[in-house]
């Protein structure tokens, strides 16, 4: 599939025209393993609004024509929820010194083409522009034997 994806970095409020598309994208991607999350457009719009209302927040969008196929977010850690900040505080980190990379979500057909790398590059550039020296993110970890984990079968002679 030829890729003609545009990467667009927007300040928080500038992403608001995309909120419905971003909400649906988050619901679609987060429904799958490892997230296993079932959200609603209403909740997602409220969640996205927290980024739009936060000074220093960034949305990095991946657009295939007019279709939003991916997004990534970031904000100063000091603006994050206590739930997100608490592990960093417990480890001795000052939230004022950290830029937090929120989610990166990308439709499956667009994975493996360097878009995720661009998400990191754009957020790092934004954090550096704001004067941050440190960036961080959180990840979902599931057990290796989780029943929803896809099993990758090794290629064997039977496949030849």
Spans of model-derived segments:
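Conserved N-terminal entry element of GNAT/NAT acetyltransferase domains
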Residues: 1-20, 24, 28
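Conserved GNAT-fold acetyl-CoA-binding loop/helix
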Residues: 27-48
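A short helix-loop-beta-strand connector motif used in the catalytic cores of GNAT acetyltransferases and
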Residues: 49-61, 77-82
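Conserved beta-hairpin
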Residues: 57-72
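Conserved acyl-donor/pantetheine-binding loop and adjacent beta-alpha core of acyl/acetyltransferases
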Residues: 72-104
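Conserved GNAT acetyl-CoA-binding A-motif
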Residues: 98-101, 127-150
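Conserved acetyl-CoA-binding loop-helix of GNAT-fold acetyltransferases
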Residues: 103-106, 112-129
